[in-house]
Regions:
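Acidic, polar ligand-binding/catalytic clefts
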Residues: 75-109, 192
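Sec/Tat signal peptide C-region and signal peptidase I cleavage site
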Residues: 16-22
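Bacterial N-terminal signal peptides that target proteins for export
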Residues: 1-8
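An extracytoplasmic/periplasmic, membrane-proximal ligand-sensing/linker region
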Residues: 179-180, 189-206, 211, 218-220, ...
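Cleavable N-terminal signal peptides
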Residues: 9-10, 20
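Pocket-lining segment of extracytoplasmic ligand-binding domains
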Residues: 80-82, 89-93, 121, 158-165, ...
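Ligand-binding clefts/hinges and TM-proximal coupling segments of bilobed small-molecule sensing domains
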Residues: 131-150, 225-287, 294-295
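Bilobed "Venus flytrap"/periplasmic-binding protein-like clamshell domains
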Residues: 23-49, 53-55, 111-175, 179, ...
């Protein structure tokens, strides 16, 4: 005996609601142990718990915008200057053409990056690393080479002044530093990989950056939009025992224009309204200023779903 159509629909209804019905999306990050990967894990957790969307991590070596533009991932994490270069086909992406599908979701927390040395090293300043061994190449993460060049430029140095040890990405660079193959480690402050390196080599020390007008001009020429911030000692940051200045630029979340508006809206809302939950998983999110999430990135359009939420929240950028 067949059930009436209405009864069948009522029985099926529970199967179409709740967590099981949530749309699953992926967030592309850099490899496990990196600052971006840790931030992405916190974001995926909050989006999954605080919205109608289920988010999972997709850690890989390539830049997060690439699978987003290709449509193989819904969200990707990057930084402000690299996203601009990618979308406009400039910088490391010269000759690759304009990307027409990548859109901005949010400007998040600052990447605070620095050179690290072993705690017992006689290296005290960035100028002191001239002639030392440092990771380079970064074929899988070309933007890392540019950031490294920016830090070197702050002291009037370049890769030509260094002994370059080739590494495909920052994770390999951290392994080489721990193994004693390099003298200097570039990484974001507070990253899991830095903590692991510190535990292995007996501690690390962060090299301060100078913010003289000349240094700022040299850095801006290499890394547009970068800035200098003061970092104070914190249990979450290895290698900082007194207030110092470091290089910074913004972490951003991007998506594809074809990702449904409601999905991006839900993700944006969850991130904006749950700073405490984000910080509970990854302490760097204590630096998040939710109402600055709508900060524009040069030459990159907002996704309509993100813009809709920002308009409702009263923080949309002025056109």
């Amino acid at each position: 005996m067949k059930l009436p159509a209405l009864a069948a629909a009522l029985l099926a209804a529970p199967l179409l609601t709740g967590p099981a019905a949530a749309q699953t999306v992926s967030i592309v990050t850099t490899p496990a142990g990196s600052y971006t990967n840790s931030a992405g894990a916190a974001m995926a957790k909050v989006i999954s718990e605080k919205s109608k969307v289920r988010a999972i991590l997709q850690a890989q070596a390539q830049q997060g915008m690439i699978p987003v533009e290709a449509g193989t991932a819904e969200f990707g994490m990057s930084n402000s200057f690299d996203l601009t270069f990618y979308v406009t086909g400039t910088g490391e992406y010269e000759g690759q053409g304009v990307k027409k599908k990548t859109r901005l979701v949010a400007s998040l927390i600052p990447y605070r990056v620095a050179f690290h040395v072993r705690a017992d090293s006689d290296i005290k300043t960035i100028a002191d690393i001239k002639g030392k061994r440092i990771a380079g190449g970064f074929n899988a993460q070309k933007t890392i080479a540019r950031i490294t060049e920016t830090l070197l430029a702050s002291a009037g140095l370049s890769y030509k002044d260094m002994v370059e040890v080739l590494a495909p990405n920052v994770s390999r660079a951290a392994e080489d530093f721990t193994a004693g193959k390099t003298d200097v480690l570039f990484f974001a402050l507070g990253s899991a990989a830095v903590k692991q390196a510190a535990a292995t080599v007996g501690g690390v020390r962060v090299l301060p950056i100078t913010d003289s007008p000349e240094a700022l001009k040299r850095m801006e020429a290499v890394l547009p939009g970068s800035y200098v911030v003061e970092v104070r000692p914190s249990p979450q940051i290895d290698g900082v025992s007194a207030p110092i200045k470091t290089l910074a630029f913004d972490m951003v979340l991007c998506t594809n224009i074809d990702v449904p508006e409601h999905v991006v809206y839900e993700a944006t809302k969850a991130l904006h309204q749950n700073k405490a939950a984000l910080a509970a998983t990854f302490g760097a999110f204590n630096l998040l200023v939710p109402d600055r999430m709508a900060k524009p990135v040069k030459d990159v359009e907002f996704h309509p779903g993100a813009l809709k939420y920002y308009q409702e929240a009263g923080i949309a950028p002025k056109s």
